[in-house]
Design a protein with these regions (language model features):
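C-terminal catalytic "cap/lid" subdomain
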Residues: 2-317
Length: 317
């Protein structure tokens, strides 16, 4: 049987079950539960590349950095390095829990994490309008000082204080693509484009430099799925299926959507929440418009059933 290749995108929030379960140990346990379902895919004959979010985790790293700088005079950690730190830590949790589960099932398959840079265009319009809040809240005095001394973009956030905002540019290329392909071809499960990848710009002739930005992890996974010619782009999220008219009396759960329907529902503007489902639908549209084969949205515990066509929302060209 010919192997089928899937890119599975996992949310950074899915490693944090609730407000009371945020520790590293809690996140490891959440990773273990998620990788059981990925092991089911592998046992069913899929090759898998895994992308993941890192929003809360980068927030924790930044907070530690800010506290250490304020209380001990330690140097602060740049945002691109925070991204690299989170790729290593989350990759380690996913890698080890998946390795353990595969070994328990008698499946011999290596698992590897690739610290991944993703190229963005230094002229992307997003750099002119930073909009992604990161880090802790500050008072106005501190915010304005950092704006002046460190060239930060800062905004007042809903009356709760001031925060730094950074750009969220579109991913253009996966710098480590050939390494990722080589590992997949050798039969490995690859954890890559973590947190959307570390955003880098090309100064000249493939001389890369990290930038303070955040790439949407679903868009980075969408790009990866396209570049490695995956048979499936699967977004693992908090809901079993996608709904239109979400939260309204005429709410309807969808088993299947065509690309045209997905674009129509998105354009109508009332179906998908801006910060949660809308970017996932946008990433899938981007994938299918550029030659992608099929996409699936479901929650981790239903991945096995969804692949059998029993649940989840399938999006097709």
């Amino acid at each position: 049987m010919a192997k089928k290749l899937a890119v599975v995108a996992i949310g950074g929030n899915s490693l944090i079950k609730d407000e009371k379960h945020k520790t590293v140990e809690d996140q490891y346990e959440a990773a273990r539960e998620t990788t059981i379902h990925i092991a089911d895919m592998i046992e069913a004959g899929w090759d898998v590349a895994i992308g993941h979010g890192n929003g809360p985790q980068v927030g924790f790293i930044l907070r530690r950095s800010e506290i250490a700088a304020k209380t001990e005079g330690m140097h602060e950690i740049p945002l691109d390095v925070c991204g690299a730190d989170s790729q290593g830590a989350i990759g380690y949790a996913l890698q080890q829990t998946l390795q353990n589960e595969l070994y328990r099932r008698g499946i011999k398959k290596p698992v590897a994490t690739v610290v991944t840079q993703v190229l963005v265009d230094k002229n992307d319009p997003a750099f002119k309008k930073p909009s992604k809040p990161i880090g802790s809240f500050m008072d106005q005095v501190e915010a304005k000082r950092r704006e002046k001394e460190m060239a930060w973009s800062v905004v007042e956030d809903a009356g709760r204080g001031w925060r730094r905002v950074v750009a969220s540019p579109l991913p253009k290329e996966v710098v480590e693509l050939e390494a990722v392909k080589t590992l997949i071809d050798a039969g490995a499960v690859v954890i890559t484009v973590g947190g959307g990848g570390i955003p880098v710009i090309d100064l000249k002739d493939h001389q890369y430099q990290g930038v303070a930005a955040v790439i949407d992890k679903d868009f980075a996974s969408s790009l990866l799925a396209r570049l490695i010619k995956a048979d499936l782009f699967l977004i693992s999220t908090a809901v079993e299926k996608v709904a239109i008219n979400f939260g309204k009396p005429d709410q309807k759960w969808l088993d299947k959507m065509t690309l045209a329907e997905a674009k129509q529902y998105l354009a109508e503007g009332s179906h998908f929440a801006k910060g949660s489902m809308a970017p996932k639908i946008e990433a899938i549209i981007w994938y299918l418009e550029n030659g992608g084969k099929q996409a699936l949205i479901t929650n981790p515990e239903n991945i096995g059933r969804a692949l059998k066509g029993e649940t989840g929302t399938w999006i097709v060209p």
